[in-house]
Design a protein with these regions (language model features):
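A short C-terminal helix-loop "cap" of Rossmann-like NAD(P)-dependent dehydrogenase/epimerase domains
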Residues: 13-24, 80
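Conserved C-terminal active-site "lid" loop/helix of NAD(P)H-dependent oxidoreductases
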Residues: 36, 95-132
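Conserved beta-loop-beta element that borders a ligand/cofactor-binding pocket
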Residues: 1-3
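Mid/C-terminal beta-alpha module of Rossmann-like enzyme folds, strongest
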Residues: 45, 49-107, 135-152
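Substrate-positioning beta->alpha
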Residues: 5-11, 25-47, 54-55
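Short, glycine/charged-enriched secondary-structure capping and boundary segments
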Residues: 7-15, 72-74, 100
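Residues in well-ordered alpha-helical elements
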Residues: 10, 37-40, 66-69, 124, ...
Length: 152
């Protein structure tokens, strides 16, 4: 995440900002994320630390977010109220099934998995090098939400 979000995050953010993205239910899935500013710091640390010796590192902000958490953070950043109602998960399942059959619909099982699947990783090895992220999604959007909203 960052001021200029890309891909699915940008679609979700713009959908929330425009009012067409449906409120996600809490499914307790787990997703890892990192702020672009922290990712750059991690890359510079890895590139300059002799202990890395060509190893591969995973960089996260250390938090596990559900898709509902991400939805709520984006609502706050766009100044939208978090709806008290949610769209049931089965509605998304049905839409994904229809999208798999009717190819021109922009929502299918691939997008469904992107929203409700787990993508959770550990950056313990990177922390051993001394990496500490400066942001989590909520603190970043609280500080820079207006800039994010203007640039997406």
């Amino acid at each position: 995440y960052g001021v200029k979000m890309k891909g699915n995050l940008a679609i979700m953010f713009n959908g929330i900002k425009s009012g067409w993205f449906p409120p996600l239910p809490e499914t307790f899935n787990k997703r890892s994320m990192i702020c672009i500013n922290d990712l750059i710091d991690a890359i510079l640390l890895i590139a300059s630390d002799g202990r890395t010796n060509g190893r591969i590192y995973i960089a996260t902000d250390g938090h596990q977010y559900s898709s509902r958490d991400i939805y709520k953070a984006m609502c706050l950043a766009t100044g939208k109220n978090i709806p008290i109602w949610v769209t049931p998960k089965f509605v998304f399942s049905l839409l994904a099934w229809i999208g798999d059959i009717v190819k021109y619909i922009p929502f299918n099982s691939h997008r469904y998995k992107k929203i409700f699947g787990n993508e959770c990783y550990s950056s313990v090895e990177l922390h051993k090098l001394g990496f500490t992220p400066k942001y989590d999604l909520f603190s970043y959007l609280k500080k820079y939400g207006k800039s994010v909203a203007e640039n997406n």
